Regions:
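Active-site beta-strand->loop->alpha-helix modules in alpha/beta enzyme cores, enriched
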Residues: 1-178, 210-213, 268-291
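C-terminal and late-domain segments of enzyme folds
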Residues: 222, 226-291
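Hydrophobic alpha-helical segments, principally membrane-spanning helices and signal/leader peptides
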Residues: 34-36, 186, 245
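Histidine- and/or cysteine-centered catalytic micro-motif in compact active-site loops
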Residues: 150-151, 187-188, 264
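Conserved residues at beta->alpha junctions
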Residues: 47, 75, 187, 199-202
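Short, flexible loop segments at boundaries between secondary-structure elements
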Residues: 171-194, 199
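A conserved mid-domain beta-alpha-beta active-site/ligand-binding segment of alpha/beta enzyme cores
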Residues: 189-249
Length: 291
C-alpha cells in the first residue's frame, strides 16, 4: 500500500475516532453570566429556535470581546413541541449564561406559527407576531441585528427572516433615524452572495460548542454539537471563494463563519459594501466592518 495513502487513511480514521469520542464529553454544563455594564453597541440575535444563538454566534461573540458589545438573544420561538418548551427554555438560559448573552422573549413562551404558511393563511396571528417583535425593537433599538437569510430552508428560519424584515420596516416608519446594520446568517441552506467571512479562534469555537451542549434534550437525540467544527472548517474553504474571489487563497485560520451584512434604509436592505470582506482572527472587527 502507498505510504502517502496510509497516512491519509490514518488521518481519516483518527478524525472519525476523535469525532466519535467528542460525543462522550459531558453535556449541559454552563458558566454563570457575568453582569457588567457594556460601552459598545447593542447587538440582537433573532433566533428561530433555541440553539441558534450558538450555531451562528461566532461574530456576536467576537463583538462582545472586541467591541464590548451588549449581546441579547431574542428567542423568537421555543420550538413547536409544546411538551419541550419549558425544557428548551431552561437549556437556552444555560447556553446564554455561558456565552454571557442576555435573553429576551416575545411573550411568556415566545411565538408560534412563525412561517410563511401562517403569513398567508392566518394573517391575524402573523400581525400579532410582528407587533410583538416591533415592541421589543422599539424598546431595545439594537444597532446590529442577526437573523437567517430568506432561503435558509427551514420554514421557521425563513419565517423569522420575513418577520424581522417586516418588523424593522414598521419601526423605521416611526423612527426614520434608526438604521440598523443587519447581518444575515446561514445554517440549513447556503445563502446567495454572502459578503462577510469572520475567522473564529479555537477558543471561541470551543466556547460555542460548550454552550451548544447545554441544549441537552436536542444533542442527546442527535449530537450535532460535535459536528459544528466540521462545518466551520468547510466555511474556511468555501468562504475564500464565495466571499473572497474564485481562486482566492484561504485565510490563516482553522474555523470561520459566513454572513451577509447590509444596512436597513427605509425598510430596504442595502449591501454594506461592494464585494466581500474576510476578517482574520487578529483583525479588528470594528474597523473591518464599520469603517
Amino acid at each position: 500500500m502507498n505510504t502517502a495513502f496510509e497516512q491519509y487513511l490514518n488521518f481519516v480514521k483518527n478524525f472519525a475516532q476523535l469525532h466519535k469520542k467528542a460525543a462522550e464529553i459531558p453535556l449541559g454544563e454552563s458558566n454563570p453570566k457575568i453582569d457588567s455594564p457594556k460601552t459598545g453597541p447593542k447587538v440582537m440575535i433573532c433566533s428561530p429556535h433555541p440553539d441558534d444563538e450558538c450555531v451562528v454566534g461566532a461574530l456576536p461573540l467576537r463583538m462582545q470581546q472586541e467591541m464590548d458589545a451588549e449581546i441579547s438573544n431574542l428567542a423568537v420561538t421555543l420550538g413547536s413541541n409544546e411538551d419541550r418548551k419549558k425544557g428548551r427554555l431552561a437549556e437556552l438560559e444555560k447556553a446564554c449564561e455561558t456565552l454571557n448573552f442576555n435573553l429576551l422573549l416575545p411573550g411568556e413562551s415566545a411565538l408560534d406559527g412563525v412561517n410563511l404558511t401562517t403569513k398567508k393563511s392566518n394573517p391575524e396571528l402573523w400581525s400579532e407576531n410582528a407587533a410583538a417583535i416591533v415592541d421589543i425593537l422599539k424598546t431595545e433599538l439594537p444597532e446590529i441585528l442577526f437573523f437567517p437569510h430568506d432561503n435558509d430552508y427551514n420554514s421557521t428560519h425563513i419565517g423569522v427572516h420575513f418577520l424581522m424584515m417586516e418588523a424593522i420596516a414598521n419601526v423605521q416608519n416611526e423612527k426614520a433615524d434608526w438604521q440598523p446594520t443587519i447581518i444575515e446568517t446561514e445554517f440549513w441552506h447556503m445563502m446567495e452572495k454572502p459578503n462577510l467571512m469572520v475567522a473564529v479562534s479555537d477558543e471561541d469555537e470551543a466556547r460555542l460548542i460548550y454552550a451548544l451542549s447545554a441544549h441537552t434534550g436536542e444533542v442527546e437525540r442527535n449530537p450535532y454539537h460535535v459536528n459544528h467544527p466540521a462545518r466551520m472548517l468547510d466555511n474556511v474553504t468555501r468562504g475564500a471563494e464565495v466571499v473572497g474571489s474564485q481562486g482566492g487563497e484561504a485565510p490563516e485560520c482553522n474555523f470561520a463563519m459566513i454572513y451577509r451584512c447590509s444596512k436597513m434604509k427605509n425598510g430596504i436592505a442595502v449591501p454594506a459594501w461592494d464585494g466581500g470582506k474576510i476578517i482574520g482572527v487578529n483583525d479588528d472587527i470594528k474597523s473591518a466592518i464599520f469603517s
